[in-house]
Amino acid sequence: MKITKQIKIRDVLVGGGAPIAVQSMTNTDTRDAQATLAQIRALADAGCDIVRCAVPDMQAAEALREICANSPLPVVADIHFDYRLALAAIESGVDKIRLNPGNIGGADRVQAVVKAAKARHLPIRIGVNSGSVEKHILEKFGGPTPEAMVESALYHVGLLNDCDFDDICISIKSSSVPNTMQAYLLASEKTDYPLHLGVTEAGTEYMGTIKSAAGIGGLLALGVGDTIRVSLTDDPVKEVYAAKAILKAVGRAEEGINVVSCPTCGRTRINLIDIAKEVEQRCQSIRGKKMKVAVMGCVVNGPGEAREADLGIAGGDGVGLIFRRGEIIKKVPQEQLVDALMDEIAHYEGE
């Protein structure tokens, strides 16, 4: 795993070997501070670490004052083109700015934003995607290739460095999973700044989760990436659940219950599909535990096949088994199986 430079977003560390931070973005009207705060609280309850809000106009920038004062999460202002919105957002108390300095005007405007960010020790994320690459770079590479996106990101980094600013995070996103992965791998070779991973315009919950798992999960498995955002055309809370599931899948989660289950076969004598879904749903919001839970379809092979699980259940004809590390610890009536498992999880303290 590559150790990058570290930035601090309120009280959340990103990079430098810190745990992978999960991000999301509100889809409320930022000008409606109460609605935005309600969504931020829901994201926090789901396990989100950092939240981003769109700042399309000055009214939204002013609303950030109330939002930032009451948000349980660090707030990132998403700025496009108008440097005055960045200055207003900083004045309102945001914890980080997301912008591309090459898109906000001349050097004097970049310097103004950098000066304000420095005064409050705020990092800036450079956010490049395949649709934002500068014309001269597109012409050089013949399109928004991974190499073009990385050159665009480094161009913006250079603008900030020219202002003696180094508190930087980078994202380089494409809707193409292969292009996204290639871009981040190249960026990881060329820079030590922390990388914010994501696949842009990933789609609805189903396809967007699959694309994000392939792209984000693949990069994390290779040791690349410091913070992640799963982009879904859906409730932002689902982005957080998907992101945390990806972290579990690649072994990078700091907490959470990793539920595994067998695919069922002719030996299955219980409604394993519904049981597995119920266990997964009930485990989703449990905080402060890190463990593996198995849901298996038969008592013959279940405990043995899932011996690496901390806890698990296996169904039979009328009676279910609860096991720990492959050893049977309890038999319970099948209709009590899930409740009995959840009770064991609640009292599990680890080895």
Report the location of each language-model feature.
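Glycine-enriched alpha-helix->loop->beta-strand junction motifs that scaffold or abut catalytic
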Residues: 70-73, 91-97, 118-121, 188-194, ...
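Alpha-helix-loop-beta-strand connector modules within alpha/beta enzyme cores
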Residues: 58-79, 112-124, 184-195, 279-283
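Glycine-rich, proline-tolerant flexible connector loops at the mouths of alpha/beta enzymes
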Residues: 27-33, 44-68, 98-106, 168-177
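Catalytic alpha/beta core domains of metabolic enzymes, predominantly
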Residues: 128-129, 137-284
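N-terminal amphipathic alpha-helix/helix-capping segment at the start of soluble metabolic enzymes
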Residues: 1-25, 118, 281
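Hydrophobic faces of well-ordered beta-strands that scaffold small-molecule active sites
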Residues: 20-26, 51-53, 75-79, 97-99, ...
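Active-site mouth loops of central-metabolism enzymes
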Residues: 17-35, 54, 73-81, 137-150, ...
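Hydrophobic or amphipathic alpha-helical targeting/insertion segments
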Residues: 84-125
